[in-house]
Amino acid sequence: ACVVYDIGRRRTLSAIGHEGWHQFNNRHFKYRLPSWLDEGIAMLFETCTYENGMYSFDAARNYPRLGALSETLMNGKQMRLGELIATSPGEVLATDENEAVMAFYSQSYALVRFLREADHGKRVTRYHRLLWDGMLGQWPLDPDASRTAEDRNLPRTVQWNRVVGPRLFERY
């Protein structure tokens, strides 16, 4: 189920694409994804075009995220990679600092695009393996982390993100 509010055509479709990814992931992946990966992928679905009765997603045209990334970098507010892959959205939202929120989301978007696209797709096979293994529940996790990854009724805690995010990034 999904509740949608009309916040203007572009923003409404952006929110539907983003939240639609979360619903898809929640339904079809055995393991939930670490926050940087889940949010990074969700932002790939925020920009779409409609032509001949079909919607097409175009991650490269997500100008709001690209603008936020540019602003983050220009202001020197970027997160270190180790911090980014170990952070959860709740942590940055709790700071009540717009720059921290912008940094987390825009850098997660950029990191996922980098893994998919950089160097003519050099890392895309490992990126796909990371997703495939998450979908099948085959990540090399200890029993507690595996239980949290699999049981959507358990909260994805800050500690889980701190352990699992970096572990998966290094593994894949």
Positions of PLM-derived features:
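Juxtacatalytic substrate-recognition/specificity segment
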Residues: 1-34, 49, 140, 156
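Acidic/His/Gly-enriched intrinsically disordered linker/tail segments
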Residues: 29-172
